[in-house]
């Protein structure tokens, strides 16, 4: 399969998932369900002016899914430092509570312990603003982010908790 064919299939799948009634989502495999809900929530958020407005456009359970998935994507892509540096200002204050709501208590404790130990105010991440790659490196060296990241990577993926959460609340997605 060439790249163009793959991308066309992916676009068709995304279109299908956006139009699919919530009740039909339950028939999808776990992987497809997770992808479908990711597409659906991101589509709602992306249609808004900014992340704050996008979060407000989601219902409570969609917001939980979006915020926890956002954390996992950022940490898996570049670590907790990247999560704080990127546009997580609206999401970071929600993460701890939402981790608990999906049953990810080990990850919740890791997150809470890290921000408490290093006095990180998740309601004001302006100290994490960066302009360059050098700024990112400086941020990365402020705290022992590898300590958090290494522990996080050894835990059950948040996707597993989120998929279960979606199945339990399928009508909200």
Give, region by region, the residue ranges found by the protein language model.
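Extended, alpha-helix-rich binding/interface surfaces that flank or overlap catalytic cores
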Residues: 3-66, 72-77, 81-92, 98-173
């Amino acid at each position: 399969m060439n790249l163009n064919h793959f991308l066309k299939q992916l676009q068709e799948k995304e279109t299908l998932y956006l139009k699919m009634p919530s009740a039909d989502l339950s028939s999808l495999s776990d992987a497809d369900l997770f992808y479908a809900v990711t597409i659906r929530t991101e589509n709602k958020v992306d249609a808004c002016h900014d992340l704050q407005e996008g979060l407000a456009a989601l219902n409570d359970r969609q917001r939980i899914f979006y915020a926890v998935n956002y954390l996992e994507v950022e940490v898996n892509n570049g670590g907790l430092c990247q999560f704080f540096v990127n546009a997580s200002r609206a999401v970071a204050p929600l993460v701890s509570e939402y981790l608990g709501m999906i049953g990810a208590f080990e990850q919740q404790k890791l997150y809470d312990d890290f921000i408490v130990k290093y006095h990180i105010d998740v309601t004001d991440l302006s100290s994490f603003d960066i302009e360059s790659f050098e700024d990112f490196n400086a941020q990365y060296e402020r705290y022992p982010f590898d300590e958090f990241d290494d522990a996080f990577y050894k835990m059950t993926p948040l996707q597993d908790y989120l998929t279960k959460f979606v199945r339990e609340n399928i009508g909200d997605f």
